[in-house]
Amino acid sequence: YTVIGAGKERDDSHEAVLGRDRQPLAHLQKFYEQTEARGVAWGGFKFMIGHNLKVLQMLAADPDITIIYIWRENRLAQVASLIKASDTKNWAQTRRNDHVTRKVRATPRQISHRWHEYATFDHLVSQWLAPLSNPKVTYEYRELFQPGFEQKLCDFLGISYDKKMKSPLVKQSSNTIEERFEEPAPIRYYFHQLGLGHWLEDEL
């Protein structure tokens, strides 16, 4: 766990994480204040279900906050990324190194538990999100990589598009999802039995 500030400064000390968790809403308010002080047009943060319930409740209570909701149809790819990040504690891959090609060690049962959990999250969140009056938009993961996505997102936010906009992240593993696992054979069998063999193929 790492606290990342508006200026991308990182602090994974016990004191920083405890301070955030002790007062999550005050921490969030400070983030927005720092963002405003830097003079940026829009400031935001990545929030995942399970991060903090008080923040989730705050999002629903503040209609001025814009919500960009991302979900992923390929649950196998999603779980592969989750397990790899959890095992290595590397939650954001920003450079190419050995971590990119490292295989995931997981069984079909472990994957089944996780993907059903995340499918349930998405189902419940979509229902939670629908009645909110916040400005909001939903994208499926693959849409983020389509030509013109940055322009479309900027249009939604009402800000000028800059051609230099680019995510600092690099892809963590093979685009062919079954190649991400140390032992793909039982996983391949399992998902073909479920009629979800397409999850094993190229995602992008």
What are these regions (language model features)?
Residues H198-L204:
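Non-catalytic N-terminal targeting/anchoring module and adjacent flexible stem/linker
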Residues H27-T35, M58, L82, R114, ...:
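Residues that form generic nucleotide/phosphate-binding pockets
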Residues K30, N97-V104, S167, H192-G195:
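Short, basic, helix/turn surface patches
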Residues G7-D12, S126-H198:
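The conserved 3'-phosphoadenosine-5'-phosphosulfate
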Residues T2-G5, G43, A92, F145:
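Generic, ordered loop/turn and secondary-structure boundary motif
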Residues Y1-A37, S173, I177-R180:
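PAPS-dependent sulfotransferase catalytic core
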Residues F47-D162:
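PAPS-dependent sulfotransferase catalytic domain
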Residues G39-G43, T66:
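Loop/turn-to-beta-strand initiation segments
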